[in-house]
Curated annotation (Swiss-Prot):
It comes from Kocuria rhizophila (strain ATCC 9341 / DSM 348 / NBRC 103217 / DC2201). Pathway: Cell wall biogenesis; peptidoglycan biosynthesis. It is a multi-pass membrane protein. One of its GO terms (molecular function) is metal ion binding. Coiled coil: none annotated. Belongs to the glycosyltransferase 4 family. MraY subfamily. It holds the Pfam family Glycos_transf_4. GO terms for biological process: cell division; cell wall organization; peptidoglycan biosynthetic process; regulation of cell shape. This is Phospho-N-acetylmuramoyl-pentapeptide-transferase.
Length: 377
C-alpha cells in the first residue's frame, strides 16, 4: 500500500510541476492546437492552446514508477523490484504514445488538423500491438507463469482458449485479438478527448478501478490457479503500482487541463492512455470486463459508429447533431463544464459497476463467503 501511495504521489508531483514547464516550451515553439472548422464554433477560442501534453503525463508515469521502485529497493528489498508485466504495460503505453506524438507533430508542422494517415497510424499501432502480444506469452517466471495467456478473459481467464487452433494459429489469433483491443482503446480515448478535462478525468476513474482490481488480485494469488477464488495473474502488485502512477500523473495534469484548459493531452496522451488501458485488460486477465470498466469510452465510440453508419444507410440523415456524443450535447446548449462533470459521473458509475461484477465473481468462486467471515462465527 505504501508503494501505491508513493507512486501516486510522485506521479502527481512530477506532473503538476512538469506540465507548466512543458506549456512554456510548447508555447515558445508555437506548438498549438489547430481546431477543425466543422467542429462546434465555441471551440475556435481554443485555437493555439499548447498540445502534446501527453508527454508530461507519460514521462511522469515512467518517472514515478522507477523512483518508487528505487526507493522500495533501498527501504524494503524484500518487496521485489521492477517486473516484466510492469515494463510491458509501460512499453505499450509509450509505444502508442509515440505514434500519437508523431501524429501531433505532423499536425503542428503542417499547421492544420491533419496528422498521420489512417493507414500509417494503423500500421504503426499494429506493429506495436503485435510486439506486445507476442512478448506477453513468453518469458515465464519461476512458477512457469507468463504475463498473459491465450485464453479470453472476463474477470479471470474463461474456458475459451485461442490456443485450440494449435500453437501457430493460436498465436496469430491472439495477436489479432490484442490488436483489436489496443485499436479499440486508443481510438476510444482519442474520441473522448474533445472537451477540457473529459478524457483526463474519465481516465483517472478507469485506472483507479484497475488499481483496485490488480491490488485485489495481488492479495488473492495462489499456486494452483484452478482453486476457487484464486487469480492466475503475473505481477499484479506491480501493475497496481503502474496504475497508481497513472492516476497521480493524470490528477496533476488535470490541474492544467480543466476548463479553460492551458494545455491539451493531444494524440500523444490519448493514444498513450489507450495503450495503457489495453495493457491492463490483457495483463490483468480482464479483457471483456474492459467494455464495462471503460464504459464511457465505449459509449462515445459507439456514438461515432452509429452516426457514420446511419448517415450512410439513410443517405445523409443523422442520429446526433454531431458526433462524438459530447459535441451533440454542446450543440443542444449544454455548457462544456456541465457535460464534462456529468460524463465523469457516468464514467464513475461504469467503473463502480465493473468493480461490483469483479468482486461478485470472486464471491461466487469463494462460495459466497466474505473475507474473514469465519471469524464472525
Amino acid at each position: 500500500m505504501i508503494q501505491l501511495l508513493m507512486a501516486a504521489g510522485l506521479g502527481l508531483v512530477f506532473s503538476i510541476f512538469g506540465t507548466p514547464a512543458l506549456i512554456k516550451v510548447l508555447a515558445r515553439h508555437g506548438y498549438g492546437q489547430y481546431i477543425r472548422d466543422d467542429g462546434p464554433t465555441s471551440h475556435q477560442t481554443k485555437r493555439g492552446t499548447p498540445t502534446m501534453g501527453g508527454v508530461a503525463i507519460l514521462l511522469s508515469v515512467v518517472a514515478a514508477y522507477l523512483v518508487t521502485h528505487l526507493i522500495s529497493v533501498l527501504a524494503w528489498p524484500e518487496n521485489g523490484g521492477i517486473t516484466l508485466s510492469g515494463l510491458l504495460a509501460l512499453g505499450l503505453m509509450l509505444g502508442m504514445g509515440m505514434v500519437g506524438f508523431l501524429d501531433d507533430y505532423k499536425k503542428i508542422s503542417k499547421k492544420q488538423n491533419l496528422g498521420l494517415t489512417a493507414a500509417g497510424k494503423m500500421v504503426l499501432q499494429g506493429a506495436i500491438g503485435s510486439a506486445f502480444a507476442v512478448l506477453v506469452l513468453f518469458f515465464p517466471d519461476a512458477a512457469g507463469n507468463t504475463p498473459a495467456s491465450t485464453a479470453i478473459s472476463w474477470t479471470r481467464d474463461t474456458g475459451v482458449d485461442l490456443a485450440f487452433a494449435g500453437p501457430v494459429v493460436g498465436l496469430i489469433l491472439f495477436v489479432v485479438w490484442v490488436n483489436l483491443i489496443a485499436t479499440g482503446t486508443t481510438n476510444a480515448v482519442n474520441l473522448t478527448d474533445g472537451l477540457d478535462g473529459l478524457a483526463t478525468g474519465a481516465s483517472i476513474l478507469v485506472f483507479s478501478g484497475y488499481m483496485l482490481i490488480t491490488l485485489w488480485q495481488a492479495g488473492h494469488l495462489c499456486e494452483n490457479a484452478a482453486q476457487a477464488a484464486c487469480y492466475a495473474v503475473r505481477d499484479p502488485m506491480d501493475l497496481s503500482i503502474v496504475a497508481a502512477a497513472l492516476v497521480g500523473a493524470l490528477i496533476g495534469f488535470l490541474w492544467w487541463n480543466t476548463s479553460p484548459a492551458k494545455i491539451f493531452m493531444g494524440d500523444t496522451g490519448s493514444l498513450g492512455l489507450g495503450g495503457a488501458l489495453a495493457a491492463f485488460a490483457v495483463l490483468s486477465r480482464t479483457e471483456l470486463l474492459l467494455v464495462l470498466i471503460a464504459g464511457l469510452f465505449v459509449v462515445i465510440t459507439m456514438s461515432v459508429i452509429l452516426q457514420v453508419g446511419y448517415f450512410k444507410l439513410s443517405h445523409g440523415k443523422r442520429i446526433f447533431k454531431m458526433a462524438p456524443l459530447q459535441h451533440h450535447f454542446e450543440l443542444k446548449g449544454w455548457q462544456e463544464v456541465t457535460i464534462v462533470v456529468r460524463f465523469w459521473v457516468i464514467a464513475g458509475l461504469f467503473v463502480a459497476a465493473a468493480l461490483g461484477v469483479f468482486y461478485g465473481d470472486w464471491l461466487l468462486h469463494n462460495g459466497g463467503a466474505f473475507p474473514g467471515a469465519e471469524a464472525l462465527h
